[in-house]
Amino acid sequence: MLQNHSIAEFDPVLWDAIQNENRRQEEHIELIASENYVTKAVMEAQGSQLTNKYAEGYPGKRYYGGCEYVDIVEQLAIDRAKELFGADYANVQPHSGSQANAAVYGALLNAGDTILGMDLAHGGHLTHGAKVSFSGKIYNSVLYGITAEGLIDYEDVRVKALESKPKMIVAGFSAYSQVVDWAKMREIADEVGAYLFVDMAHVAGLIAAGLYPNPLPHAHVVTTTTHKTLAGPRGGLILSACGDEEIYKKLNSSVFPANQGGPLMHVIAAKAVCFKEALQPEFKAYQAQVLKNAKAMVEVFKQRGFEVVSKGTENHLFLVSFVKQGLTGKAADAALGEANITVNKNSVPNDPQKPFITSGIRVGSPSITRRGFNEADASTLAGWMCDVLESIGKDNYDQVIAETRAKVLEICKRLPVYGD
């Protein structure tokens, strides 16, 4: 018999962990570039009765009965995704960005085929051909990188493409702060007869707002997550505007039944909500502020003598290198965490440290902007971060941490996430 008990009543240990996480999110400043705060409407969709419904297949072609209403939900998400990004194909079923990427590879490649992707150590993603990932184990991965100035080396991409003759070139990143020339990538792909696959997960929100170039006119296939700058539920999305129906059929089959079974209908509903939110004028204003806040923070770090990789940012994130200071990313991450400022350690180009230690941090502005931070707030925050970083290993460290934590708590109270 169904028991309608609350988590607090039934599982107080779990409830305490949830409440403590709620408190942490309210009392800490979130600067992890891949994180964001969803609206209550998105959470409402994820907590709906749609979680009960199994719906293998696609709208109108299900393997289960009783799907007439979840068909409406999924079709809404599909139509809104197409409108948002200018696509003529959308698959909203991938459970994550990595699973979306796996589906693209499965649709267009065979095991052992060559892919050319961005080196993880230079800003790429695990699924772009890293040897520890399925993408580097199942496929023959060749990697391109960035120049000494921190910019994608398109000549390096072209030379390696001509040498390796990849079946697919992967463009996109997880830690690159400049604008990718999608047209140049397509030109190189066409020169060697390769597919161009773009993973726009980090900048999807900026693209939706028209503030970062859209890869859809250039790529054969595009994937994204639905969180990060898009500020929706954790999930994946596959898009295309290439007009090739055979590719679309292969993509659908690669998601289901090849890689996944039943879709998560409650998450797809939340994706539909987030796509509608991203179609509103307020969303563009939000993304514009994300850019302004990131740029404001960069200027402070540079003024305080820290190296910003590629010398700036044209999106929501930037990397700070501590090679010159002899500081590790792990130590910086931990120190900032003590002050209630959350970042992630990150490798920088030619990093002398191991990937779990690193010599840098990645900083992102989406979450603070959702709280209501403006450029002045962002600049002030960057100054506090520099104070903490400069105090590491010095006698005043504990004092700086305590003072910074107090200031963080004050601004978090002034600019709450949810306000209740």
From Swiss-Prot:
(6S)-5,6,7,8-tetrahydrofolate binds at residues 120, 124-126. Its EC number is 2.1.2.1. One of its GO terms (molecular function) is pyridoxal phosphate binding. The modification N6-(pyridoxal phosphate)lysine is found at residue 228. It is an enzyme of class 2 (transferase). CDD domains: SHMT. PROSITE patterns: SHMT (PS00096). It holds the Pfam family SHMT. Pathway: One-carbon metabolism; tetrahydrofolate interconversion; Amino-acid biosynthesis; glycine biosynthesis; glycine from L-serine: step 1/1. InterPro entries: PyrdxlP-dep_Trfase, PyrdxlP-dep_Trfase_major, PyrdxlP-dep_Trfase_small, Ser_HO-MeTrfase, Ser_HO-MeTrfase-like, Ser_HO-MeTrfase_PLP_BS, SHMT-like_dom. Catalyzes the reversible interconversion of serine and glycine with tetrahydrofolate (THF) serving as the one-carbon carrier. This reaction serves as the major source of one-carbon groups required for the biosynthesis of purines, thymidylate, methionine, and other important biomolecules. Also exhibits THF-independent aldolase activity toward beta-hydroxyamino acids, producing glycine and aldehydes, via a retro-aldol mechanism. This is Serine hydroxymethyltransferase. It comes from Mannheimia succiniciproducens (strain KCTC 0769BP / MBEL55E).
